[in-house]
Amino acid sequence: MCAPSLTNLGVCPCETINIRLIKKESMSYLFTSESVSEGHPDKVCDQIADAIVDSLIAADPQSKVACEVLATRGQVVLAGEVRSQGYVDIDATVRRVVEGIGYNQAAYGFDAHSCGILSAIHDQSPDINRGVDRSAPEEQGAGDQGLMFGYATRETPNYMPLAIDLAHSLLLELAHIRKHEPSLMPYLRPDAKSQITIEYSDDHHPLRIDTIVLSTQHDEFITPEKRQSQDDADSAMRQRIEDDVRSLLIPRLVARYDASIQALFQGDYKLFVNPTGKFVIGGPSGDTGVTGRKIIVDADLALELAGRKTGGRG
């Protein structure tokens, strides 16, 4: 009679067989998250729209505001619908936001003092307003819905997943240097993007930092000398920025965290700084920005890179 434990596997012990026990090998995996700076063209638009909404709600808490923004070389375009008893100076608000971000020089191709501002914001349709303006709070509607997903985690004190928290913090430190300690990296301009890749164990514990990618806009602070090509000058600029990132920026990033996270940086991680070689033309001058394309960066989540976004640099 066949043994039950083997017949359950579809194997008869009456036959000559070899059975190999297979042990599942542990397998680590890589997890990547991305952040963009306040000077990224899409985030410029988000911040302008935020400021318009905030100003109107401050003036009239019952305001209903839909505001979309497009920013490109030398130009900001606003469109949307508003129902409010408040007033906001669109022109002044836009220039204040752009100035605060750091676009304050004509050499950037987009600056607070000279950019054109076109506003096509108009009254909200009364037909739409009927659906979103109710006297009873429990009957209050919403014009649009957005769906995001994510999770809280104990990886960081603020419950953010570690990869996205590191990506955010790297750019916050970069912005602090640019605005408050410019002598350290005097060539910095506002636009930047970061990516952090972490190796995790198969039971989802961070093992080490695998890769740090930072693209940061900069002045053209090295020009070709005699018998030197433009490529040589570009290479020298990129190397200077990489050296500063390694010696100044990353130590500041690491210092923000406790010893357990600091230990993840002790391995031989890969560092890519301005991997295209040069990033002088940036911000809305180099890449048109639109509201709503960086919602994922604002959400409290980290997502594995599962596909590529078509068109532009994303």
Predicted regions and their residues:
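Cysteine-centered motifs
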Residues: 2, 12-14
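Short, charge-patterned binding micro-sites
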Residues: 66-84
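Short glycine/threonine-rich loop-to-helix capping motif typified by GTGT followed
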Residues: 81-88, 276-295
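Conserved mixed alpha/beta catalytic, RNA-binding, or beta-rich assembly cores of soluble enzyme
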Residues: 250, 290-314
